[in-house]
């Protein structure tokens, strides 16, 4: 297969999004068909690339001597590309009903397609320079998704999102400069890390930590997490879903590439970099859960939940062992499914009823049973209830913590994960219970069915079903992630 196929999932949606401003669709249906066709084609190309190719690579051009724009589809790239393109497709389908009365609908889709292409480039980047270039593009192009409503609150949130993104990117850029100088080249991703970097000076440790912190901004890691709860309540529900479920994972991918494919896990194991990383991750897990527990605005509660849940991933990565690494990658997938389901469910409720508070949702299970059943399944998955997929990832994370060899983390990690799971139950289960069991004094006669159309329901059902299926049969994913772990550890 021609290696130029790597450019298709990147250029197709970017070109389609840019051209969207030139097309005049007389009917919304034709606009939706256009957007869906592009997203479906991108997802299909990513799946075919993952299944039918080994590890194709493509060097486009040199920026400076020894610094190239280079793409390569290794196993990790394929996992992230398939995840992002498929979830992007489902969120796009969901948005057709959510935005059907929005005057800025076409502008939203143009930006949405462009961001999807930039994310594909991010996944397929073959070196740290290429990754960083598209990481910056992603931050800039995704900001209008937050800004979409053009209210005072959305403008403030968009500026905050961009400020935090740029600040994190500058921290990461410092690390890239140092590692590029020490490594003497383009910092191509190599499983296990680059030997040139591992033989470098002590300042390399600080550079690596700056990259963890910088890319961790996008993942919502403390202390640079504040953009998440600001951006989610003001963004349209489809944008909130992908910000939480997908764009945060771009930060996770940056950390994985920097630590496991450039620095090398062995290089930082047992150093202050690992210990501080573990501490920051556990603090964020607990803090995010506490803030979510106290929050009364539904989408903001889910945003704080993302701060906590993505830090489960960061915690697993910080332990630098196979079980924790597998658990972290599993949680990347499973959190994306659950959190997209939750945000889309919340968006459906807001769209149909106008209710935005966590204490306003009594009886919504009677009004919108399919939506709220999907919401409930996703909630149980995030809590970690078997046989849903969240249980599997958290099992591997706890196992990795016990095997970490870090005396405090060995017992403190599972304890904090358990406390966080209880807090997660505390802020999600009451919503589900009041939705289906509002109490004997509730006025059922005033309720009317407000279930959305299949365009909203199909993505919700698909992701909720996957949360069950992958929880019962996780073996295929576990084997794939174990192969990646064996290569980098």
Regions found by a protein language model. Name each.
Residues 28-39, 156-166, 368-373, 453-462:
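Alpha-helical transmembrane segments and their helix-start/interface "positive-inside/aromatic belt" motifs
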Residues 136:
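Short phosphate-coordinating micro-motif centered on Lys-Gly-acidic
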Residues 1-8, 15-110, 186, 193, ...:
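Transmembrane helix-loop-helix hairpins at membrane boundaries of multipass inner-membrane proteins
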Residues 97-111, 442-455:
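Cytoplasmic juxtamembrane regions at transmembrane-helix boundaries
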Residues 35-48, 165-174, 375-383, 462-475:
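Hydrophobic alpha-helical membrane-insertion segments
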Residues 14, 35-43, 85-88, 113-117, ...:
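Alpha-helical transmembrane segments
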């Amino acid at each position: 297969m021609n290696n130029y196929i790597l450019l298709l999932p990147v250029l197709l949606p970017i070109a389609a999004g840019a051209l969207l401003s030139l097309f005049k669709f007389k009917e919304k249906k034709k606009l939706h068909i256009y957007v869906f066709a592009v997203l479906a084609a991108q997802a299909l190309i990513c799946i075919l690339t993952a299944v039918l190719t080994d590890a194709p690579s493509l060097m486009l051009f040199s920026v400076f001597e020894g610094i190239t724009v280079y793409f390569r589809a290794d196993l990790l790239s394929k996992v992230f590309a398939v995840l992002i393109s498929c979830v992007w497709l489902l969120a796009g389908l969901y948005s057709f009903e959510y935005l059907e009365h929005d005057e800025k609908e076409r502008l939203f889709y143009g930006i949405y397609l462009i961001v999807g292409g930039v994310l594909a480039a991010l996944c397929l980047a073959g070196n740290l320079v290429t990754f960083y270039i598209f990481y910056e593009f992603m931050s800039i192009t995704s900001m209008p998704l937050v800004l979409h409503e053009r209210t005072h609150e959305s403008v403030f949130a968009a500026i905050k999102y961009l400020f935090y993104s740029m600040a994190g990117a500058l921290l990461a850029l410092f690390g890239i400069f140092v590692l590029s100088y020490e490594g003497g080249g383009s910092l191509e991703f190599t499983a296990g890390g680059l030997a040139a970097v591992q033989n470098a000076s002590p300042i390399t440790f600080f550079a690596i930590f700056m990259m963890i912190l910088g890319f961790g901004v996008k993942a919502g890691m403390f202390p640079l997490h504040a953009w998440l709860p600001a951006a989610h309540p003001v963004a349209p529900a489809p944008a909130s879903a992908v910000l939480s479920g997908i764009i945060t994972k771009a930060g996770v991918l940056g950390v994985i590439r920097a630590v496991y494919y450039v620095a090398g896990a062995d290089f930082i194991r047992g150093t202050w970099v690992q210990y501080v990383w573990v501490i920051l991750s556990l603090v964020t897990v607990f803090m995010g859960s506490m803030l979510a527990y106290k929050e009364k605005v539904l989408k903001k509660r889910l945003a704080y939940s993302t701060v906590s849940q993505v830090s489960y991933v960061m915690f697993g990565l910080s332990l630098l062992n196979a079980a924790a690494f597998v658990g972290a990658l599993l949680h990347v997938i499973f959190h994306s499914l659950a959190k997209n389901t939750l945000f889309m469910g919340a968006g459906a409720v807001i769209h149909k009823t106008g209710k935005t508070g966590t204490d306003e949702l009594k009886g919504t299970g009677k009004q919108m049973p399919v939506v709220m059943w999907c919401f409930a399944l996703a909630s149980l998955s995030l809590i970690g209830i078997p046989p849903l997929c969240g249980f599997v990832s958290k099992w591997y994370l706890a196992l990795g913590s016990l095997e970490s060899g870090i005396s405090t983390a060995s017992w403190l990690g599972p304890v904090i994960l358990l406390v966080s799971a209880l807090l997660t139950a505390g802020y999600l289960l009451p919503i589900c219970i009041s939705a289906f069991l509002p109490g004997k004094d509730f006025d059922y006669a005033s309720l009317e069915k407000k279930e959305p159309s299949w365009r909203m329901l199909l993505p919700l059902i698909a992701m909720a079903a996957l949360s069950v299926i992958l929880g019962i049969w996780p073996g295929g994913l576990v084997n794939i992630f174990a192969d990646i772990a064996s290569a980098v550890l």
